[in-house]
Regions:
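Short, aromatic-enriched amphipathic alpha-helices that serve as compact interaction elements
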Residues: 3-19, 23, 281-307
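Short Pro-Gly-centered beta-turn/loop motif in secreted/extracellular proteins
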Residues: 138-162, 224-251, 256-268
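Short solvent-exposed beta->alpha transition segments
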Residues: 24-85, 311-354, 365-366
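Exposed beta-sheet edge and beta->alpha loop/turn motif
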Residues: 59-149, 158, 170-202, 342-391
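Long, low-complexity, Ser/Thr/Pro- and Asp/Glu-rich intrinsically disordered
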Residues: 242-244, 248, 289-391
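Conserved "repeat-terminator" motif of extracellular CCP/Sushi domains
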Residues: 103-107, 182-197, 258-287
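Lumenal/extracellular ectodomains and adaptor appendage modules
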Residues: 196-205, 209-210, 217, 222, ...
């Protein structure tokens, strides 16, 4: 019997008799050390109903290649999974023992990855020896290399650089028995942690770039494409959004989320109340219209103040103790002839209780562009001119 073929038959018997210890030793080398659990996973895989026939055919082909004994043939074949991914390559290892060629049964391990988002993840687990992996934020990081089969590994994960930090005890689950061809494998994480995406409804009614998410009342910038997390979440997290219109803040509904139970982000939908925003818009429009009328009335009274050289005509329009008040008290007494005409309002903006009005007016044939700041009291529904600048 060809001795190389005998070594393959010996391996067959080890698999047949579930000799996990011997299989692990045969598959281990200077680069990789396989455990009995790795060997058990391999045996369970090749003995499964779906893979038994393919495994037998591959073993027979390897023995046939040995029988053919082609010159310079150092690789006799491979045991693969159902997608053609190499599991074990059987070849000469270049050594002889009493004129007998030794075979190497070289396992192919698969890299398994984890993905972090706005956090750093530190994983600690046992695989033959203690492992520690630091996964940086917004990166895919290799967790380790694993053989064929399914693994469920007790793991401690520490979340850092996140809104909610902490250490979690859970497990990572890995399934290499049905991974397709050339697919990157990610570990399924079983921890009390959360990560999610957020879609806002009715946000177009508010100002762009005014949105914030509040996660347990800690605000972060909103981005519809962003994944938020991963967050330490032993119980639940509170999430809602705020947005602004003319400085007024609006809030969405609040969602309390629990931990993730699969390897995908949760998809949250938060909605601003359209009726609330429309109601504010309607009331604010009336305020701005009233501000236009107010500034026109003020301009008429300002003309009187200049004509009579008496500040009293505008004293009820100008904010007390403002810089504008000091300035106008001097100006109305000057010898200059001032009479503003052709007042045209070009723009009105609001920010909370400040109304900003841009207008044009003429004086002695010259056109002036003036910007006014009005202070609005939403209780009395009254205005005071706080500042003005001519361009």
């Amino acid at each position: 019997m060809n001795n190389a073929k005998g070594q393959v038959k010996e391996f067959e018997k080890l698999v047949q008799h579930n000799d996990y210890n011997s299989i692990a030793k045969k598959l281990s080398n200077k680069e990789e050390t396989l455990s009995e659990n790795d060997a058990k996973n391999f045996v369970l895989f090749v003995k499964s109903k779906e893979n038994q026939e393919q495994y037998n055919e591959q073993i027979q082909k390897i023995k046939s290649n040995i029988d053919k004994n082609k010159d310079n043939n150092t690789v006799y074949g491979s045991i693969t999974d159902q997608y053609g991914n190499n599991l074990i390559t059987i070849k000469k290892n270049g050594k002889t023992f009493f004129f007998i060629d030794k075979l190497e049964f070289k396992p192919k391990l698969t890299s398994v990855y984890v993905k972090e988002f706005n956090n750093t993840g530190i994983y600690k687990y046992q695989q033959e020896n203690a492992k520690k992996v630091i996964a940086e934020s917004n990166q895919t990081t290799e967790l380790g290399k694993f053989f064929i089969g399914k693994y469920s590994i007790k793991t401690d994960k520490t979340i850092e650089d996140s809104i909610h930090n902490g250490t979690l005890t859970g497990k990572i689950d890995i399934d290499l028995s049905n991974r397709g061809n050339n697919n990157k494998i990610y570990a399924d994480e079983d921890f009390n942690q959360s990560w999610f995406k957020v879609k806002l409804n009715n946000d177009s009614l508010l100002e762009k770039n005014s949105y914030k998410l509040l996660i347990d009342d800690k605000d972060v910038d909103y981005n519809s494409k962003k994944t938020y997390g991963k967050y330490y979440n032993p119980t639940e997290l509170s999430v809602y959004a705020i947005g602004k219109l003319e400085g007024k803040e609006f809030k969405t509904n609040r969602i309390n989320i629990r931990r993730n139970y699969d390897n995908k982000p949760q998809n949250l939908k938060l909605s601003f109340k359209e009726s609330q925003i429309r109601d504010y818009e309607s009331k604010s429009k009336k305020v701005k219209e009233k501000a236009k009328s107010y500034i026109k009335e003020y301009t008429k009274e300002l003309n009187k103040a200049y004509k009579k050289k008496d500040y009293k005509y505008i004293s009820d329009y100008v904010k007390n103790n403002s810089q504008l008040e000091k300035q106008l008290k001097k100006q109305v007494k000057s010898k200059s002839k001032v009479k503003f005409k052709d007042v045209k309002i070009n723009n009105v903006k609001r920010d909370k209780n400040k109304i900003y009005i841009e207008l044009s007016k003429t004086n002695n044939g010259n056109v002036f562009q003036t910007k006014y700041t009005l202070d609005y009291d939403n209780v009395s529904n009254e205005f005071l001119v706080e500042d003005s600048h001519d361009n």
